[in-house]
């Protein structure tokens, strides 16, 4: 019965995915994933990007957020795209591959970019989803807190933190932690995010 339910969810997701207007638009316009449109909408509504920004993109694979950001910050800005998975090269984007849950890898990344002032840390990180929310949610929160830790270390004064999270157990605690570190906080759910998804975005400014 459990196997059948998982198969049903998987088939439903695949059907939705291939019928999705943003998936089709991404394919048509040589964009790496539909996540590009989420960031575009968040940016249009909140004016996140400015020319010359230095940006860290966490959970960057396959690279659609970095694709979008590189067009918005211009040649004077810099983007570091980070992920445990490999990312195909993107013009104007530096790529750092590693698992940031490993302290040595995390410290290596922080030390590598310690001389750069970052204006934006954006995180689209998510674990491999099992479909069991009691298992998935703690893993999601763990990655969110890791992104928050990185933002603490690298963000400039008035820096911006954009974080993807999910509503569920542990979210309220995470929100309180962010509220202690940032002056302005806004919770967003772009139209491009699927209606039944618990996915939300936190936009915080120092």
From Swiss-Prot:
GO terms for molecular function: rRNA (uridine-2'-O-)-methyltransferase activity. SUPFAM superfamilies: S-adenosyl-L-methionine-dependent methyltransferases. The active site is at 164 (proton acceptor). The keyword DNA-binding does not apply. Pfam families: FtsJ (PF01728). It catalyses: uridine(2552) in 23S rRNA + S-adenosyl-L-methionine = 2'-O-methyluridine(2552) in 23S rRNA + S-adenosyl-L-homocysteine + H(+). InterPro entries: RNA_methyltr_RlmE, RNA_MeTrfase_FtsJ_dom, rRNA-MeTfrase_E, SAM-dependent_MTases_sf. S-adenosyl-L-methionine binds at residues 63, 65, 83, 99, 124. Gene3D superfamilies: Vaccinia Virus protein VP39 (3.40.50.150). Keywords: Cytoplasm, Methyltransferase, rRNA processing, S-adenosyl-L-methionine, Transferase. GO terms for cellular component: cytoplasm. Its EC number is 2.1.1.166. It is an enzyme of class 2 (transferase). It is found in: Cytoplasm. Its main location: cytoplasm. Specifically methylates the uridine in position 2552 of 23S rRNA at the 2'-O position of the ribose in the fully assembled 50S ribosomal subunit. HAMAP family: RNA_methyltr_E. Belongs to the class I-like SAM-binding methyltransferase superfamily. RNA methyltransferase RlmE family. This is Ribosomal RNA large subunit methyltransferase E. It comes from Buchnera aphidicola subsp. Acyrthosiphon pisum (strain APS) (Acyrthosiphon pisum symbiotic bacterium). The gene is rlmE.
């Amino acid at each position: 019965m459990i196997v059948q339910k998982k198969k049903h969810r998987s088939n439903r997701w695949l059907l939705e995915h291939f019928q999705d207007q943003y998936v089709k638009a991404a394919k048509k316009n040589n964009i790496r994933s539909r996540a590009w449109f989420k960031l575009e909408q968040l940016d249009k509504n909140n004016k996140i990007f400015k020319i010359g920004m230095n940006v860290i993109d966490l959970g960057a694979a396959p690279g659609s957020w970095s694709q979008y950001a590189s067009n918005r910050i211009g040649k004077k800005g810099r983007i570091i795209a980070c992920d445990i998975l490999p990312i195909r090269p993107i013009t104007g984007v530096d790529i750092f591959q590693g698992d940031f849950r490993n302290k040595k890898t995390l410290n290596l990344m922080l030390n590598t970019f310690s001389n750069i002032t970052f204006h934006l840390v954006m995180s689209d990180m998510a674990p491999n989803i099992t479909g069991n929310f009691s298992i998935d949610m703690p893993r999601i929160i763990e990655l969110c807190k890791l992104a928050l830790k990185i933002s603490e270390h690298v963000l400039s004064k008035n820096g911006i933190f954009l974080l993807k999270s999910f509503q569920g157990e542990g979210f309220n605690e995470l929100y309180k932690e962010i509220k202690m570190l940032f002056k302005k906080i806004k919770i967003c759910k772009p139209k491009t995010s699927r209606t039944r998804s618990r996915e939300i975005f936190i936009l915080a400014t120092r």
